[in-house]
Amino acid sequence: MGRTRKQLRIIGLCLLLSAASSAWALDASLVQKLESAKYVYISSQRKDGSWSRPAEIWFLYHKGAVYVGTSPKSWRAKRIRWGRPRARIAVGSVDGPAFFARGAIVQEPDTVEKLLEVFARKYADRWAQHEESFRHGFRDGRRVLIRYTPE
């Protein structure tokens, strides 16, 4: 079991080193992909330093950050509340270009409105099924807004 953890730490270090070039600002090609991709795949960091399985999620790229609406009971939200805000975000596919970010649960009503507007266009084929859940969820606390700021 110790060997597996060691291997995971080595993999994590390799990912960290591969993202070093984007530590201060996202590469222009990555920004372009964020502006055109339908999905991001978010892995949150576990207590032991390993990464969760990437989860596909709808997102908004706005003012240099990635925003998602999620259940406050989701692992990504729980880990942020528990002081582990670090995430790895892959763009477009699980093995797409990726960067590290810090998540924060935020109260930004204007950004929520922007997110809902963008989702209505970006995910038009499925929006009718989910719109009420998103709108009511942000109002009654069944959804929280997470802002991921690139490291």
Model-derived regions: residue spans:
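Bacterial N-terminal signal peptides that target proteins for export
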Residues: 2-12
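Bacterial N-terminal signal peptides
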Residues: 10-20
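A short linear-motif detector with a strong N-terminal bias
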Residues: 19-22, 36-39, 46-47, 65-69, ...
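Boundary at the C-terminal end of the N-terminal hydrophobic targeting segment
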Residues: 23-27
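Short, P/G- and charge-enriched loop/turn segments at secondary-structure junctions
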Residues: 28-30, 45-46, 131-136
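N-terminal helix-cap/turn-to-beta initiation motif at the start of protein domains
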Residues: 31-35
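Short beta-strand segments
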Residues: 37-72, 87-90, 98-100
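Short, structured beta-strand-loop surface elements
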Residues: 73-151
